[in-house]
Amino acid sequence: MRGFLHHLFRDKSVATMLLTASFIIGLCALAPSLFVLIVLDKYLASGITSTLISLSVGAIILLCFEFAFRQNRASMIQALNRKIFQPIVNALNKKIKETQISGEEFKTIEKAGAVIKGATNSSITGYILDWPFVLMFVIALLFINWTAAIIASIFMIIMMVLTAQRVNLNLQQDSTANLEIFLMGLMTITILAIGSYSVLQYGNITLGALIGSNILASRALQGANKFAKAREAIKQRDRATAQIISFVNKK
């Protein structure tokens, strides 16, 4: 991750804008779960239509803001990646044209170049930038439903460990996707089962808080999964970059 931070803060003004955009995106991402919580707890209790309309309009506006900021952030990330990695790719292409290399070495360098091209898309950097605000979801969960926060944290750790070890487990991409779906469904069942019991037996949580906390937990688990994948992609990109720089500088 040190390489990622160095890469990000090469242009401090762009880094500041990216972090600001990520903060706003994180806040706006809370809208669906808070909307469910307030509608189920407040509107159904009062029955005032104007309250529902106001809440719906507010939630839609926040979702639009989230979409707009994500689009803007993606454009900034792509521009930053091109500025940093395009010169490396150009230097590689020039070196290959000027140097005679074996077929095996060419395959290795070509693979490294493909890794860089694939890992410079905006999604990977975006997933890393979203990670602090994924943790914010867990903190919000602690105030809404601490049981769901603990369950979500456990599943997040499991998801991240399995994602990091997927090579050792020899899991294909389809198998990994199936595992993600399984963990997501299992977490939902666990949260709703324990939460429903708490609603009936202790009354220490409302129905709106239960459903809202499940939405937040799902977003947190998805964020953990994306972060783990992005972290592995960043590691591969750093190794590929080192290979290419070593090859380009070789006399």
Regions picked out by a protein language model, each given a short descriptive name:
Residues 58-65, 210-226:
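Hydrophobic transmembrane alpha-helices
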Residues 32-39, 57, 73, 77, ...:
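Hydrophobic/aromatic residues in alpha-helical transmembrane segments
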Residues 220-247:
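Cytosolic ends of transmembrane helices, especially the final helix of ABC transmembrane type-1 domains
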Residues 17-24, 58-62, 151-155, 176-180:
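Alpha-helical transmembrane segments of MFS and MFS-like solute carriers/permeases
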Residues 1-30, 45, 49-55, 73, ...:
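Membrane-integrated ABC transporters
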Residues 37, 41, 45, 66-74, ...:
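Membrane-water interface at transmembrane helix exits
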Residues 1-2, 78-118, 167-169, 238-249:
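Extended non-transmembrane interhelical loops and adjacent amphipathic helices
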Residues 30-37, 125-167, 172-214:
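A hydrophobic transmembrane-helix motif
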